[in-house]
Amino acid sequence: LPDSNALAIEIKSSWVEASTLPNPQDYVTVNAIIPTYDTTNNQIWKPNGEKKAKMALIGIHIVGSVAHHPEMIWATFEHESNTPNAKYQYVDSTKAKTVKTVPQDKGTGWLFSNTTDTALTAYNNSHMTDTTATGAATDNIIATPGNTISPSNTMQTLPWGSAWGQPTNQQDSSSAASNSEIISINNNVRGMIPGEDIRKNYLFIGAIWTFKGTPPTGNGYDQNPVNPPASGTTIGTSVLANTTMETYFQSPNFSCFTCHSDSPASFAPASISHIFSKLEPLYRVHDQLNKKKK
């Protein structure tokens, strides 16, 4: 291809141990080596080794290259059983184009929620972190103040990457219009996947990019809904979040570009992607492997 960046792709995914699921056959699975922890203290878990395990895919970001969009297109997908949705609206497919409201999901049995409480305050309260009180990141899992290391209930508060009553881009007049497009894509693609293919169990939540492919500023369209949008404004489903990776970062003011951007706005690889700052020379990896063998 004439462009060396054509077809470039970046993937970030989230997994759980398949052995913890009642229906692992409904998930994409892989075998992996994962860290193990000493869990005797409910305030801090420390790594104590590794093990082989079958892992089940629960969420995935796919960042793909598109002509004239050097910021790339950021899409995210989730397993349909992850979390309940907050209420949202869509436009039905009848001639009347009626706006319909889907009430907040209720009930138990979700992978990351098991409460009958319908108050939004019952959800998305983190019980653990990897950061110390001084702000230093560690390999430990640490209980947040007043909690033990334990499960908490999660909700998708911004279904389909839009905020209730707020426009998400310059072409859709409402969140209902934007939601309808994402729901329609899911219905159409699922209709083309044959039989009991497990890919039917995953939902496209949405995708974002910037207006005219300009360097991202991190500002979402809903924060300044003008037409045309300002340079670097996030459009598409502009408050996109994945409940398995941005669990506690769901906000009508946030999207992928909130973190994957710089000031001043730039297309520099390290400004858009977090991978480049974490790259390690191969000779260093080689030396580490040799030390382990000894």
Task: Report each predicted region and the residues it spans.
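A domain-level signal for the mature, folded cores of soluble proteins
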Residues: L1-N48
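Sequence context surrounding c-type heme c attachment/ligation sites in exported
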Residues: A8, A18, N23-V28, M55-H61, ...
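A short linear-motif detector with a strong N-terminal bias
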Residues: T39, K51-K52, G236
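Amphipathic interfacial helices
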Residues: W45-K46, E50-K52, H68
